[in-house]
Amino acid sequence: EMLFGRLGEKKIYVDMIVQSTGKDNQASISFTVLKKDLPEVLAICEILRKEWKASEVTAKEDIAIVSAVGVGMMSSYGVAGRMFKVLSQHGVNIEMISTSEIGISCVIDAMYAELAVKAIHKEFLEN
């Protein structure tokens, strides 16, 4: 709440958010922001890291978000599996996943964006 409250006050748009707990019950949070906002986001995160005595703040810049979108998609069986399989078959590692009723979005390495879009398009629109 504190982190995203501060980002909201600065009018920084946060898209995908993933929280996980690793070894020793340490929480980790990952989220995507616009590249133009990254320096300000890192500054806010670093302030909070010190307050919370957290271990580190890292950022990855060269990412892309690819999505498969369609009404009622999540109620259709196998959509996520098909998308993940086709990305895997093309050597594309998925770093984050977000789902909604109308779509699935994946964060991937930016260098695979065009390949991923073509592969997803072929899987869902040409098959």
Where would I find each of the regions flagged by the language model?
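A conserved regulatory-domain signal marking ACT and ACT-like small-molecule sensing domains
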Residues: E1-N127
